Amino acid sequence: MSYKNKVYVSMDADNDLHYYYLMKAWKQNDNTRFNFYDAHDINTILDKSEESIKRGLEERFRNTKIFVLLVGEHTRYLYKYVRWEIEQALKRGLPCIIVNLNGKRSMDSERCPAIIRDELAIHISFNAKILQYALENWPESYERKLKEGKTGAYYYTEDTYKGLGL
């Protein structure tokens, strides 16, 4: 069994890829604490067939411990890969962090894909501090809530955001 320490980031690559690149820039910035082990660094998928792409994505999932979904304006309409990635995360029981690119700090029912709206997940705004906080704290909370049989959308309180200076 492989050691799972990666963060798998799913997004609308046509419209929201720059947010993923911003996360990578935060990681490189010496002035932030932000850090994550990117599952997308595991392999490069060159073949453009759907079967080959999904095979490469499955390899990334095998080393993943946390699933992050960047939710933009069009995310809920994406079925070919984003929905498949969400299905994989849920099937594998990964803690899910849903990041609202519009700044909303709770579940955005208009943008969040239906497949994950009622699943156990934390919904946050797009910001390095709250995302780092979620990466560090949500997996343990997720496991506890899972054992308690809880489901549904969770979000951090305003006090949590204030404590982070947000």
Where are these regions (language model features)?
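Conserved N-terminal substructure of TIR/SEFIR domains
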Residues: 1-63, 150-166
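Short catalytic/ligand-binding loop motif for oxyanion handling, primarily in non-cytosolic enzymes
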Residues: 16-19, 76-78, 104-109
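Anion (oxyanion) recognition and catalysis
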Residues: 90
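Low-complexity, flexible helical/coil segments
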Residues: 41-49, 69-73, 101-108, 132-137
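Conserved beta-strand-loop-alpha-helix hinge of the TIR/SEFIR fold
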Residues: 60-86, 94-104
